[in-house]
Amino acid sequence: MTYDNGTTLTVAGRTYTIADIDSIVVNSRPVTAGQVEVSYSNGGARVFMAGDVAPYLTASVSGAHVSITAAAGLTQEVNYVLSGTSSDGSFTQTGSYKMRLTLQGVDLTSSSGAAINVQNGKRIKVVLADGTTNALTDAASGSQKACFYVRGHAEFAGGGTLTLTGRKAHAFASGEYTELHSSLGHIYVASAVTDGFHVGQYFRMAGGKLTIAGVKSDGIDVAATNHSTDENNGQVMISGGTLTIALDAAHDVKGLKADSLITISGGNITITGMGNGQKGIKTATNLLVNNASGTAPTLTITLTGTTYNKGQADESKTRGIKVDRDFTFDGGTINISTPGPKAKAIVVDGTYYYKSGTINCPVSAAIVG
């Protein structure tokens, strides 16, 4: 700590104007190097920064709404650890270097915007601390894209649980790819005004548990970016874990939707719905189901609806699986029930290639290879 000419005070590399300081609190609380701890309570929030990263970070706290901006000169990964509860709080991070976000028993409901808003285009590793329960709810109004938004690419890990409630739009959204690692515990989408997960570039699930319910649009929607050279652009890749999507009574929606290839090589997928015109799985290109992960996948789809807007320009028929190009089935088990009028289990506009596995439903294909 340096006191200079009675006008400034420098602490841990940051200089403050004396006239702007109304109090100084000194305590013995340790903060791990490279870490920022944000502790919420209904009355507000407190931010604790490690000395090695404090010079590069600027924090703003208004009630329990916390915003932290990382300077361009930051060249180390910071771990932001959120804990505590607030019925009117949020967390926003802005920066340009990869970071870690640890949810360590945090419960936030925002009255203005997203509950968590990461305006950082780099890799964001989200860790659900083992044994913790976390919950996020955004405001019912505002311009936010999701309750939990990541501008860059998100990677989820950690054995805790996270419940998301999207009151304005999506429950979770990322501008670039999203991955669920094998160490993941459970992410539960309780409800969303639009999609449960809305992901740019690609979605990869290697393990853990993802449950999506109460959505008024698609369960998982993966959109290709505008850059055709982006890796796995528009794809879905599922090699493990348990994915459960309940579309409920929403009409003309999809459980799992992708702009490009969907590859399912492991895991257990269950999709249910009772609205009209629903699609359990919908790909704009090809579908590949095999056991390349070493464990054969199981797909169970039950859609009880019929045709949406029958006879209209936007008519949509119920389909368990709809493939715009080719479908290759080479391992696993597929069970589909679509008992409604005009509904079908699997429709393939291109070629259907059967190699191995158990499929307990009819396949309607333009060509059988």
Mark where each language-model region is.
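A composition-driven surface/loop motif
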Residues: 29-369
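Compositionally biased alpha-helical segments
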Residues: 1-29
